Regions:
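Acidic, low-complexity intrinsically disordered segments
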Residues: 1-202
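Short, electropositive alpha-helical surface patch
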Residues: 52, 57-66, 222-228, 293, ...
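Structural recognition of alpha->loop->beta junctions
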Residues: 99-118, 201, 252-262, 318-333
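Flexible glycine/acidic-rich beta-alpha junction loops that bind and position SAM and/or redox cofactors
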Residues: 8-14, 96-99, 219, 271-276, ...
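Structural detector of well-ordered beta-strand residues that form the stable sheet scaffold
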Residues: 87-88, 108, 131-132, 236-238, ...
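Alpha-helical structural signal in soluble globular domains
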Residues: 34, 38, 78, 82, ...
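Radical SAM enzyme core and accessory elements
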Residues: 2-8, 40-43, 103, 123, ...
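Radical SAM [4Fe-4S] cluster-binding motif and immediate context
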Residues: 144-301, 308, 312-317, 321
Length: 428
């Protein structure tokens, strides 16, 4: 039997669709890992390669985030019109299974590791069900190593992606992670992770941990980082800003090869942080916190959500000044996006403030709700100005002109974001 896994592309002309550096979908490699060996599994990434709708694959499997969902449905229609069976999973489908079922033959709701073998067995016997939802999560100790061989020959910047934990103990209003995983924070055994890392470094010393919060449990993270010390790895992941308060853990991360962290500052307004549910973020300490990262050789890709009720047009120059004064190596400025399943969507729906459910525009670059502190035009123009200004050469010089070991990552990252923003503006 043959299976074709497809990662749908982002809408063209959007920032995330224009970035030249791309990472593979680890979730598809994880699904491949729980696929029985009698299946021949291949991958197609719609972002940069054509889809063969006349493939001889027996089963087509898609995953999608919300802005990719319309493209995923288009792809599904192309295959179903040729008599192929199409199944789909991912964050968007898990929150809107009925919508997906009008476009595909079956959906996987939630984590697919447990139910995937059963779905395949049902397909082979002609008894495919419409919805597959696990009764319990797979033990993290039982999750097999992702089948990264499906990435071979693809145009990816890095295929050394790995997941050590699932979930997040926090419950931020705008975040999809809790809606998908719940508030459980589950961890793979440290020994398993270290063994997998030993294999990964044979291909490349750079590793990206896709964990949503790799330091949520210091009793887990500390021995992990200590075990990684001396491996010669250079790695990136996600951590909250209050990671800076744990100097021992941060020092261990730096010594183990951490070059950078995606850090959700989210807002400079403490009232907005409280509304978001960012219970550990303290805006008054952000500057010192950023310095603590730098002191340990760890660069920051900061994230600041634009459009919360406390934001006014003054937020844009204020954010630029902060980012430059804090010398953040890189940053993104996503527009508040009320994704299906999130608490912020439920709140904005109750307030009658959702103005669009065109999923293509749920890309963190378009406004889909009525803001309070400014007009839609002011928010959109402020977003565009902030991105252009932050990734201008003068700003890049002010932020990263001093040599720092993380420049090997953040130098190219800044140039990549700058080029993508310019391509987006020119309509390339």
């Amino acid at each position: 039997m043959k299976m074709l896994l497809i990662s749908p592309g982002w809408p063209k002309g959007r920032l995330w669709g224009e970035l030249a550096f791309r990472f593979p979908s680890l979730s598809l490699a994880a699904i491949a890992a729980v696929t029985p060996p009698e299946w021949d599994v291949t991958l197609c990434d719609d972002s940069f390669e054509p889809i063969n709708f006349d493939t001889d694959a027996d089963l087509i499997a898609l995953t999608a985030m919300t802005p990719q969902a319309p493209r995923a449905y288009e792809i599904a229609a192309g295959f179903r019109s040729r008599g192929k069976t199409v199944v789909m999973g991912g964050f968007h489908v898990s929150n809107l299974p009925d919508e997906a079922l009008s476009n595909v033959d079956a959906v996987v709701v939630g984590e697919g590791d447990v139910v995937w073998p059963r779905l395949l067995a049902d397909f082979c016997t002609g008894n495919l069900q419409r919805i597959y939802k696990p009764d319990a999560m797979m033990s993290m100790a039982d999750i097999p190593v992702a089948r990264r061989e499906i990435f071979k020959g693809k145009d990816y910047l890095l295929t050394n992606t790995i997941q050590t934990t699932r979930g997040c103990p926090f419950d931020c209003e705008f975040c999809s992670v809790t809606a998908f995983y719940g508030r459980n924070y589950r961890k793979r055994p440290v020994e398993q992770v270290l063994s997998e890392l030993q294999g990964l470094k044979k291909a490349n010393s750079f590793v990206f941990f896709v964990d949503d919060n790799i330091v949520a449990d210091r009793k887990y993270a500390l021995p992990l980082f200590q075990g990684m010390k001396g491996m010669g790895l250079k790695w990136l992941s996600h951590a909250p800003i209050d990671f800076a308060a744990d100097r021992e853990l941060m020092h261990a991360a730096g010594e183990s090869g951490c070059l950078g962290m995606f850090v959700g500052f989210e807002s400079l307004n403490q009232e907005s942080l409280s509304a978001m549910g960012k219970v550990t973020n303290r805006a008054q300490s952000f500057m010192a916190d950023a310095q603590a990262f730098r002191d340990n050789g760890i660069g920051i890709l900061g994230s600041f959500v634009l459009g919360y009720d406390g934001d006014t047009p003054e937020i844009f120059p204020k954010l630029l000044r902060f980012c430059e004064d804090a010398r953040l190596e890189a940053a993104i400025f996503p527009l508040l996006t009320p994704y299906p399943g999130t608490a912020v969507r439920r709140r904005l729906e109750a307030e009658g403030r959702i103005i669009s459910s065109n999923w293509r525009d749920y890309d963190m670059e378009h406004i889909n709700f009525q803001p309070k502190g400014m007009t839609i035009q002011q928010l959109q123009e402020g977003y565009d100005w902030l991105n252009r200004s932050f990734y201008s050469f003068p700003s890049m010089y002010r932020r990263i002109f001093k040599l720092h070991r993380s420049v090997q990552v953040f130098g190219p990252m800044n140039l990549g974001f700058r080029a993508a923003i310019r391509r987006k503006r020119s309509g390339a």
